[in-house]
């Protein structure tokens, strides 16, 4: 059990992503990597976090923090399939166990279930809302559909309008796939023109296999040659996509529109932690807890072989600071193949997410990122711009000055 005298190994934030409704969702996006996690809990009729589980997690999670700020991240599936009363209960528990710490909440939703009531709740309690939307209607509706195959874009846009109406802070997470990657500027301008100031791109890279329990996606531990899902973006598409958007952003939107990968690139150029595990030297600092208390190494590693335990039997500290998770964290760097170790852009990329590192490098060593070619194209392309922005920051000048320089050249 946790107590006031417990000591964490080091002073840094502890992050756990919560799945209060498990993998349940009102959409059936064709590329979704999480829907099939329901197969892991086939013997559980209702994948809903109990009030008892919510309270135990809230207490332990806050007590485990060594920093004055605590971030609760609600994810899915679709977390709005839980009622507002569930989240009101969550807020009451956070207040009960806060003990002077600052509590923040962020929720990631597909946006289709947003109502005035939800948006009033988010506004009153200062929640950040992440919206999953894949750009203009044609690209979004290509993959993001209902279980009946119906489009979802119009409902998402209605949800965004409600967020704006109630002045809820929101950002966007956009999946880049084989279809929309061919239209980078139209894709980027859609978000910018809709007032989205913070934008995250997530490239789809999934391999298809078969498991006895019905799951079809491969984990990193499955090192056989496995075909890619049709929605997967190619390395060439990914590189061209990033370079094309960057060229537009660096001339018009620096300091106005914040694109996660561009921010992370500049952070690594400066030699500071980028804040996103994929572009950090090590990962494993952001676990995930399912509805029943099962804790896994990462949201992209919810596979039996990466299960750390259950909160009913072990503390969060024991699981997330334990040797199994520490080994998982170190492996991101120690498992890099020779080609990565020799690469002049390794400091910026750090091999990206381990889930995508299933190729062999030019020396025949395993562990090369499938998207390596695209990332190298991007980092090589942005290098002179990053060098300039780094110099501006070191001189305590805004990196947005680069827009004036490019305008005058």
PLM region spans:
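Flexible mid-to-C-terminal extensions adjoining Fe-S/redox cofactors in radical SAM and related proteins
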Residues: 302-409
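Radical SAM enzyme [4Fe-4S]-AdoMet core and its adjacent flexible, acidic
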Residues: 146-154, 161, 165-278, 282, ...
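Cysteine-centered iron-sulfur cluster-binding motifs in ferredoxin-type domains/subunits
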Residues: 21-28, 78-81, 283, 340-342, ...
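Extended hydrophobic secondary-structure segments that form protein cores and membrane-embedded regions
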Residues: 16-19, 71-77, 104-109, 259-261
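Long, charge-rich, low-complexity alpha-helical segments
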Residues: 1-11, 189
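Radical SAM/AdoMet-radical enzyme domain recognition
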Residues: 58-73, 82-220
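Canonical Radical SAM [4Fe-4S] cluster-binding loop centered on the CxxxCxxC motif
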Residues: 10-52
């Amino acid at each position: 059990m946790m107590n006031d005298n417990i000591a964490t190994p080091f002073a840094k934030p502890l992050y756990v992503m919560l799945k209060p409704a498990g993998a349940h969702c009102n959409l059936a996006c064709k590329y979704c990597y999480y829907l099939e996690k329901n197969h892991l809990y086939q013997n559980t009729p209702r994948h809903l976090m109990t009030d008892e589980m919510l309270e135990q997690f809230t207490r332990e999670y806050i007590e485990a923090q060594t920093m004055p700020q605590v971030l609760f991240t609600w994810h899915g599936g679709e977390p709005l399939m839980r009622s507002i009363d569930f989240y009101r209960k969550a807020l009451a528990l956070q207040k009960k166990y806060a003990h002077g710490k600052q509590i923040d909440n962020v929720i990631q939703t597909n946006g289709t279930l947003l109502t005035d009531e939800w948006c009033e709740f988010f506004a009153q309690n200062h929640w950040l809302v992440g919206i999953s939307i894949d750009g203009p209607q044609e690209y979004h509706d290509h993959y993001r559909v209902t279980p009946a195959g119906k489009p979802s874009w119009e409902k998402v846009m209605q949800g965004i309008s409600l967020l704006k109406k109630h002045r809820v802070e929101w950002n966007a997470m956009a999946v880049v796939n084989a279809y929309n990657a061919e239209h980078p500027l139209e894709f980027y301008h859609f978000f910018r023109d809709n007032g989205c100031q913070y934008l995250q791109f997530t490239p789809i890279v999934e391999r298809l296999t078969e498991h006895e329990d019905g799951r079809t996606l491969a984990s990193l531990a499955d090192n056989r040659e496995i075909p890619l899902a049709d929605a997967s973006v190619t390395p060439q598409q990914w590189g061209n996509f990033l370079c094309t958007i960057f060229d537009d952003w660096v001339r018009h939107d620096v300091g106005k529109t914040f694109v996660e990968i561009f921010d992370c690139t500049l952070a690594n150029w400066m030699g500071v932690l980028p804040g996103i595990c994929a572009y950090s030297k090590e990962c494993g600092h952001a676990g995930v807890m399912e509805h029943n208390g099962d804790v896994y190494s990462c949201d992209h590693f919810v596979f039996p072989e990466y299960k750390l335990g259950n909160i009913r039997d072990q503390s969060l500290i024991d699981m997330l600071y334990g040797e199994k998770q520490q080994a998982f964290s170190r492996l991101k760097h120690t498992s890099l193949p020779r080609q990565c170790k020799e690469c002049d852009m390794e400091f910026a990329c750090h091999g990206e997410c381990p889930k995508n590192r299933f190729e062999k490098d030019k020396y025949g060593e395993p562990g090369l990122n499938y998207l390596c070619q695209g990332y190298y194209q991007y980092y090589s392309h942005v290098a002179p711009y990053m060098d300039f922005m780094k110099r501006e920051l070191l001189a305590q000048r805004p990196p947005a000055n680069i827009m004036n320089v490019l305008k005058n050249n």
